[in-house]
Structures are given as structure tokens and as C-alpha cells.
From Swiss-Prot:
The gene is cel61b. Binds 1 copper ion per subunit. It comes from Hypocrea jecorina (strain QM6a) (Trichoderma reesei). Lytic polysaccharide monooxygenase (LPMO) that depolymerizes crystalline and amorphous polysaccharides via the oxidation of scissile alpha- or beta-(1-4)-glycosidic bonds, yielding C1 or C4 oxidation products. Catalysis by LPMOs requires the reduction of the active-site copper from Cu(II) to Cu(I) by a reducing agent and H(2)O(2) or O(2) as a cosubstrate. Monomer. O2 binds at H184, Q193. This is AA9 family lytic polysaccharide monooxygenase cel61B.
Amino acid sequence: MKSCAILAALGCLAGSVLGHGQVQNFTINGQYNQGFILDYYYQKQNTGHFPNVAGWYAEDLDLGFISPDQYTTPDIVCHKNAAPGAISATAAAGSNIVFQWGPGVWPHPYGPIVTYVVECSGSCTTVNKNNLRWVKIQEAGINYNTQVWAQQDLINQGNKWTVKIPSSLRPGNYVFRHELLAAHGASSANGMQNYPQCVNIAVTGSGTKALPAGTPATQLYKPTDPGILFNPYTTITSYTIPGPALWQG
């Protein structure tokens, strides 16, 4: 058991050195909710279990990314070998979700940030990720005047990003898919880096709108999309944020 603990520590260290980040936690109107963190993977390996959290299980052991050549694989849904979170957080429609990335400072100032949502027909804790159809509710790209990307804004905000749950969204069980697309290598084929992170949230309130038909995660992006393969190191006057159209609610 002692050797397992040592291996776990080494694994966590390797992740912090080689990797980039994941959603460590998220708050809703100030209420803290734990995300799935790398420590939990090693807890599962050593003990067979880990804490019940709303963040989805994923095996991004290097805190790394999904590359464009993996866009048609299940890993693009909610990261590598992802599985639903064991519980759901609760939030009223119209609430703000603040996603906290970590464990260190996000290293990439180039690239957009997007967030999707899907309603589960039952509990999101047992949903089949391959059957989910995603609707985009938030997107941010580049400020053409300042040439500052959304990910630089995230860094300036202490690795935090705020997403508003549409006020009109009807009550139900939802999975929110929050994603950074790091574009520092986007000028080369297969150079974009996607960091999808998923959390379960039970939405309450008086909203009445159902989500429109969504898009399977494996169809959200193509490696040659103009917002995926482009030169981020030139003055940008037009940029198409990857993914389907934004739902206005």
C-alpha cells in the first residue's frame, strides 16, 4: 500500500509538471462545488473509490488536451475516458456558474472559451455520454480592438470564468460542458488543444424553454474549421468561434 501511495504522489507530480489544467471546482451564487481532480483518479486506483462530486470523472492524467485528430472519438465529449459525476449541483435558472481552473496558472493566453449544455432525460449521473446532444450557451473569442483573447481574460481573472445559466431554461437535470480551446499551436495541422470539462447541475426555477436540438460532441468541430486551423500570431480582424451557433435562450 505504501508503494501505491508513492506511485500516486509521483503521478500527481507528473501531472502538475507536464499538464495544463482542469476545472478544480465551480461556484454557483457563492456556493462551492467540487470538481473532479487528478487526486481522485489515484484514490480510485489505490482504494477503489473516491468522493462523490458533480464533476465528471476523466483520465486526463497529464492534465492535457484532446487534439483535432481525436474530434470524432468519445474523448472529445468530456475528456479522456470520461464518466458522469456521481451527484449533481443545484442552481436556479439565471444563476452564474464560476468555473475555477487549476491547479496552476493557466499558461495559454491564446484561444476561445465555450460552454455547452444538454438536458438529461433522467438522472445525469447514469447518462450515456455518447447519446448527448450539445447546445452552446456561451462563447468568447478575441477582442479585435485590443487583440486580447478570452483565455487571457481568464488568466487575468485568477483562472476563473463565469457562465450564466439562461434565465429561460426550464427546470431539469443538465450536463454543462465547459471548454478551453488553446490556440497557441493552431497555425499547424492538429495544433489546437481542446480541454473539455463536464459537470452535472440540476436547474430549478420558473423557466419554461426547452433546449433546441443539439449536436453530438463528435460533430462539434472539424480539424480544418477556420476557428481551429489558423494563425493566432497575426493581427486578427475576423474570427469564427468553433462549434455550432450560440443559443440565445
